[in-house]
Amino acid sequence: MTRAWTALVPMLALLLAPHAASAETRFALIVSGASGGEKYAEQMKQWRASLQTTLVNRYGFDEKNVRALTDESVAGGTTGSAANVKAALSEIRKIATKDDLLLVVLLGHGTFDGETAKFNLVGPDLTAAEWNQMLSAVAARLVFVNTTEASFPFLEALKAKGRVVITATNSAAQKYATVFPEYFIKALSEASTDLDKNGRTSILEVFEAASLAVKQYYEQRGQLSTERALIDDNGDGQGREQGAEGADGGFARLWSLDAEPAAATNNPELAALLKQQRTLEAQAEELKLKKGDMPPADWQAAYEKLMLELARVSQEIRKKS
């Protein structure tokens, strides 16, 4: 038995053990920083409202778990300042578990001075490294979406296996205001984004739909695209564009903003099976990332064992559904 296989045995034993069902809580933090002018302030207001409404009405987020920080033009709002961002994430950190999901969406403007990437806030800005430090303290699964110009460096700064990071640009040199946020929010709100028609809209489906819409936006105007969105979830910080080949997208394909199926059933046994299915699917994606680090025979044996167990669990789910 190889050392790699020996290390994998405890993981498989944990996977195959019965899982207790627990309810997933979904959190969202929508941050609008400095508006950059009246035109952008009105635009961000519309985006914030649409995103909040979509998360609550379409995806069933609890209103109290959807936090929006506003630009400086909103009277009486909680502004998107560094202090308020830190406070909001601190509150989530205290209650979020590894089974929960946190969506962070940045709306506004970003900068890159050749060394440091920042998201423009009301008052002092936060760097990509500072965002990573704060978010790494939160136990929940993370979907981080920076919709601004010059957002590309955030991909490298926030990279982590199993963490979904989306940026509106594929280069720090892309410094024009983006249309990606408009189409990202639109993709979230439309039923047609669920391409596989399984009743759940995955993060990958939203990314693909939004990216394609951005491409069409520029093509219809006969303009050269100044933005190309990237998605990274394998932790290499490279990312890939919509339609491109690459390892990224495995976790984003599994993750959705919809409530987990386990939360929709009153059958504890079925809920436990659904949760185990999600765990097995995620572990299969993790194993794919280890393919080059293990002897081929050991990797194949481990993968086949996972697939057999996933098939068994899926069959049990069908019987009890």
Feature roles, as predicted:
Residues A49, V143-D233:
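Active-site-proximal C-terminal subdomain of hydrolase catalytic domains
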Residues G80, L107-V138:
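A short, glycine/acidic-enriched catalytic loop
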Residues T147, N266-K319:
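Alpha-helical, heptad-rich or low-complexity scaffold/stalk segments
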Residues D194-E281:
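Caspase-like cysteine protease fold
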